[in-house]
From Swiss-Prot:
Protein name per UniProt: Expansin-A2
Alphabetized Pfam families for the sequence: DPBB_1, Expansin_C
Main location group: secreted
Chain ranges of the Expansin-like CBD domain: 172-252
Function: Causes loosening and extension of plant cell walls by disrupting non-covalent bonding between cellulose microfibrils and matrix glucans. No enzymatic activity has been found.
Signal sequence coordinates: 1-26
Native species: Arabidopsis thaliana (Mouse-ear cress)
């Protein structure tokens, strides 16, 4: 990187800090807020697989290349996993590419308190930052920009098919990974019910979108209630058959 490029990135970084701390009034601007974005994961986004939401292979789970790791201020301890955001690069015509993208939250961008917020600590609180999969970033900005100011807002997630439930764990510890959630995309609460009981049991978030139950459920068909952050609930009755096995994935209803 030559001196001119370094000076540009340093200047942009300082401007970006001021940019991201200013919030747009959502009532006047359709919910748009301001933040900033960088990229990671390589040209093929292979470095974005896995992540703090627990989705694993983002291609097989349907999230693909349009993904983002969120800073602490946005990630909310995993509660925003699966949420969809529209982003557009703003206020830098030299590096911005017109148009917007929609990305899903699939990972956490951890803070780095050894670095200043305006000089490498992009994901430090209270900054609202998106570390985008590289192919997604390149749709709104040039590679050499490194970091750009963005406008962003929550948007509904459009998904094909139903909500997916992947059953992991052991007979006395069921860990259910929930993916492909439409609507708000992120989940507020999950309950399950075995076919041998009339009672719904609340599940607890273990990490990301992995939800746990300590109830013995082998030999029972399973039903799920999923409530998103908008407060809407989808019930998938007997979506898991009685002869289910750990490692299997089942598809239920959708928002």
């Amino acid at each position: 990187m030559n001196l001119t490029e370094y000076s540009h990135i340093l200047f942009l970084s300082l401007c970006t800090l001021n940019f991201c701390l200013y919030s747009i009034n959502s009532d006047d601007n359709g919910g748009w807020e301001r933040g900033h974005a960088t990229f990671y994961g390589g040209a093929d986004a292979s470095g974005t697989m896995g992540g703090a939401c627990g989705y694993g292979n983002l291609h097989s789970q349907g999230y693909g290349l349009q993904t983002a790791a969120l800073s602490t201020a946005l990630f909310n301890s995993g509660q925003k996993c699966g949420a969809c955001f529209e982003l557009q690069c703003e206020d830098d015509p030299e590096w911005c590419i017109p148009g917007s993208i929609i990305v899903s939250a699939t990972n956490f961008c951890p803070p780095n308190f050894a670095l200043a917020n305006d000089n490498g600590g992009w994901c430090n609180p209270p900054l609202k930052h998106f570390d985008l999969a590289e192919p997604a970033f390149l749709q709104i900005a040039q590679y050499r920009a490194g970091i750009v100011p963005v406008a962003f807002r929550r948007v509904p997630c459009e998904k094909g098919g139903g909500i997916r439930f992947t059953i992991n764990g052991n007979p006395y510890f069921d860990l259910v990974l929930i993916t492909n959630v439409g609507g708000a995309g992120d989940i507020r609460a999950v309950s399950l019910k075995g076919s041998k009981t009339d009672q719904w049991q609340s599940m607890s978030r273990n990490w990301g979108q992995n939800w746990q139950s300590n109830t013995y459920l082998r030999g029972q068909s399973l039903s799920f209630q999923v409530t998103d952050s908008d407060g809407r609930t989808v019930v998938s009755y007997d979506v898991v058959p009685h002869d289910w096995q750990f490692g299997q994935t089942f598809e239920g209803g959708q928002f």
